[in-house]
Swiss-Prot record:
UniProt subcellular location: Cytoplasm
Domain RNase H type-2: 11-200
GO function terms (MF aspect): manganese ion binding; RNA binding; RNA-DNA hybrid ribonuclease activity
Alphabetical UniProt keywords: Cytoplasm, Endonuclease, Hydrolase, Manganese, Metal-binding, Nuclease
Annotated family: Belongs to the RNase HII family.
Catalytic activity of the protein: Endonucleolytic cleavage to 5'-phosphomonoester
UniProt keyword Hydrolase, yes or no: yes
Annotated protein name in UniProt: Ribonuclease HII
Top-level enzyme category: hydrolase
Source organism per UniProt: Histophilus somni (strain 2336) (Haemophilus somnus)
Required co-factors: Mn(2+); Mg(2+)
Binding residues annotated for a divalent metal cation, in chain numbering: 17-18, 109
InterPro entries assigned: RNase_HII, RNase_HII/HIII, RNase_HII/HIII_dom, RNaseH-like_sf, RNaseH_sf
Subcellular location, principal: cytoplasm
Length: 211
């Protein structure tokens, strides 16, 4: 951590972060973590700056050493109904609610905070400044990546393990070739455009049934 973050003077502080706002498919996943100040974890940083191997190792260490940790999520149908921002806030609320210890204060990565029953603060670049947020970003990233690997096993033709659901050139090509799965976010532009094109051409289009 290059800069020094001034922590609030309370006992239990939770860090919260999200992964998966940008992908076209799957849930947005959040995590909340309360670290043990007497059992520090070395090497915590923004999950995007860590190798996959290091993330997996740190995720296990976080789960073992943290006083409490939990995951929250908002499904594609909720994202389509609420929009991605509000769905992310909902997933963050769920992560905090799922903690076995209720925090006295919550630090959230970014510039917005969800509605919570305790005090909270948004921290821009918090995943690089606050250990609790870094830990949350790692847990959320590992959890969502594992979900994409599982989706890849079910639908290998989409190459989800490679692009993790983000709108890469490969992903857009496979989406156009194989169609929209139930796990896709239909409100996201590339998916919405494909569905609209198919409907406008009067194609009979049925969502693929899960294998």
């Amino acid at each position: 951590m290059t800069n020094v973050f001034i922590y609030p003077n309370v006992e239990f502080i939770a860090g919260v972060d999200e992964v998966g706002r940008g992908p076209l498919v799957g849930a947005v996943v959040t995590a909340a973590v309360i670290l043990d100040p007497h059992n520090p974890i070395e090497g915590l940083k923004d999950s995007k700056k860590l190798s996959e191997k290091k993330r997996l190792l740190l995720a296990e260490e976080i789960k073992q050493k943290a006083l409490a940790w939990s995951l929250g999520r908002a499904e594609p149908a909720e994202i389509d109904k609420l929009n991605i921002l509000h769905a992310t806030m909902l997933a963050m609320q769920r992560a905090v609610e799922n903690l076995k210890i209720q925090p006295h204060f919550v630090l959230v990565d970014g510039n917005r905070i969800p509605q919570l029953p305790m005090s909270a603060q948004a921290v821009i670049k918090g995943d690089s400044l606050v250990a609790e947020i870094s830990a949350a970003s790692i847990l959320a990233k590992v959890a969502r990546d594992q979900e994409m690997i599982e989706l890849d096993r079910r639908y290998p033709e989409y190459a989800f393990a490679q692009h993790k659901g983000y709108p890469t050139k490969l992903h857009l090509e496979r989406l156009a070739q194989f169609g929209v799965l139930p796990e896709y976010r239909r409100s996201f532009a590339p998916v919405k455009k494909l569905l609209s094109t198919l409907l406008s051409k009067n194609h009979e289009y049925v969502f693929k049934i899960q294998k």
